[in-house]
């Protein structure tokens, strides 16, 4: 199975797998059952921003999700990613819809990793930034239903030609280049990721959510990982 660390923007509470009974931001370490969550006042039809950061000195993974003009949601979890993830990983975004649906539109995405060893400063760092997405992106690995549209957006899950979200959809987008996320001799390792998103839904209960995730380089969408499993995990254990 893949080794996954993720920050989930979970729009639909699945209390049967340990979700709180409201939309939430969660930190997932090798399981869909979040280690830490915070209530998320999700706003459909508004552009939101998610910022995720990790620092190997503090050994803390944190996320802040906000909408312009309203308060932000913050969640963090203390974890040493050296003990969780392989040394080389890929970073990605995933989303799903189920019986209920929503658009999972990504407008921009940037990522910077910092890996400083005593001998070489920043030689192993990686930076990318998408302010829009090209029609046939060579620098993204698109999995299942994920596509880029003519407006320069990344649609992680299926939308109709008129832009309406479709149910039972799963999609992921990964940056093509592997990231050197840690090294034994590193003085400091860390990363910052930011993406802007737009969730729209005709349903009273939008579903299911968007994640930023880090995984082994050969990661693929597990069978049966749709809906509440957010395209990341084969089961709810």
Swiss-Prot record:
<feature type="binding site">
    <location>
        <position position="12"/>
    </location>
    <ligand>
        <name>Ca(2+)</name>
    </ligand>
</feature>
<dbReference type="GO" id="GO:0005537">
    <property type="term" value="F:D-mannose binding"/>
</dbReference>
<dbReference type="GO" id="GO:0090729">
    <property type="term" value="F:toxin activity"/>
</dbReference>
<keyword id="KW-0464">Manganese</keyword>
<comment type="subunit">
    <text>Equilibrium between homodimer and homotetramer. Oligomerization is pH-dependent with homotetramers forming at pH 6.5 and above.</text>
</comment>
<feature type="binding site">
    <location>
        <position position="228"/>
    </location>
    <ligand>
        <name>a carbohydrate</name>
    </ligand>
</feature>
<feature type="binding site">
    <location>
        <position position="10"/>
    </location>
    <ligand>
        <name>Ca(2+)</name>
    </ligand>
</feature>
<comment type="similarity">
    <text>Belongs to the leguminous lectin family.</text>
</comment>
<dbReference type="GO" id="GO:0046872">
    <property type="term" value="F:metal ion binding"/>
</dbReference>
<keyword id="KW-0800">Toxin</keyword>
<feature type="binding site">
    <location>
        <position position="19"/>
    </location>
    <ligand>
        <name>Ca(2+)</name>
    </ligand>
</feature>
<dbReference type="InterPro" id="IPR050258">
    <property type="entry name" value="Leguminous_Lectin"/>
</dbReference>
<dbReference type="Pfam" id="PF00139">
    <property type="entry name" value="Lectin_legB"/>
</dbReference>
<feature type="binding site">
    <location>
        <position position="10"/>
    </location>
    <ligand>
        <name>Mn(2+)</name>
    </ligand>
</feature>
<keyword id="KW-0106">Calcium</keyword>
<dbReference type="InterPro" id="IPR013320">
    <property type="entry name" value="ConA-like_dom_sf"/>
</dbReference>
<keyword id="KW-0465">Mannose-binding</keyword>
<feature type="binding site">
    <location>
        <position position="8"/>
    </location>
    <ligand>
        <name>Mn(2+)</name>
    </ligand>
</feature>
<comment type="function">
    <text>D-mannose/D-glucose-binding lectin. Has anti-inflammatory activity in rats. Induces histamine release in mast cells from rat. Induces lymphocyte proliferation and IFNG production.</text>
</comment>
<keyword id="KW-0479">Metal-binding</keyword>
<dbReference type="InterPro" id="IPR001220">
    <property type="entry name" value="Legume_lectin_dom"/>
</dbReference>
<dbReference type="InterPro" id="IPR019825">
    <property type="entry name" value="Lectin_legB_Mn/Ca_BS"/>
</dbReference>
<feature type="binding site">
    <location>
        <position position="14"/>
    </location>
    <ligand>
        <name>Ca(2+)</name>
    </ligand>
</feature>
<feature type="binding site">
    <location>
        <position position="12"/>
    </location>
    <ligand>
        <name>a carbohydrate</name>
    </ligand>
</feature>
<dbReference type="GO" id="GO:0030246">
    <property type="term" value="F:carbohydrate binding"/>
</dbReference>
<feature type="binding site">
    <location>
        <position position="34"/>
    </location>
    <ligand>
        <name>Mn(2+)</name>
    </ligand>
</feature>
<feature type="binding site">
    <location>
        <position position="19"/>
    </location>
    <ligand>
        <name>Mn(2+)</name>
    </ligand>
</feature>
<dbReference type="InterPro" id="IPR000985">
    <property type="entry name" value="Lectin_LegA_CS"/>
</dbReference>
<feature type="binding site">
    <location>
        <position position="208"/>
    </location>
    <ligand>
        <name>Ca(2+)</name>
    </ligand>
</feature>
<feature type="binding site">
    <location>
        <begin position="99"/>
        <end position="100"/>
    </location>
    <ligand>
        <name>a carbohydrate</name>
    </ligand>
</feature>
<feature type="binding site">
    <location>
        <position position="24"/>
    </location>
    <ligand>
        <name>Mn(2+)</name>
    </ligand>
</feature>
<keyword id="KW-0430">Lectin</keyword>
<protein>
    <recommendedName>
        <fullName>Lectin alpha chain</fullName>
    </recommendedName>
</protein>
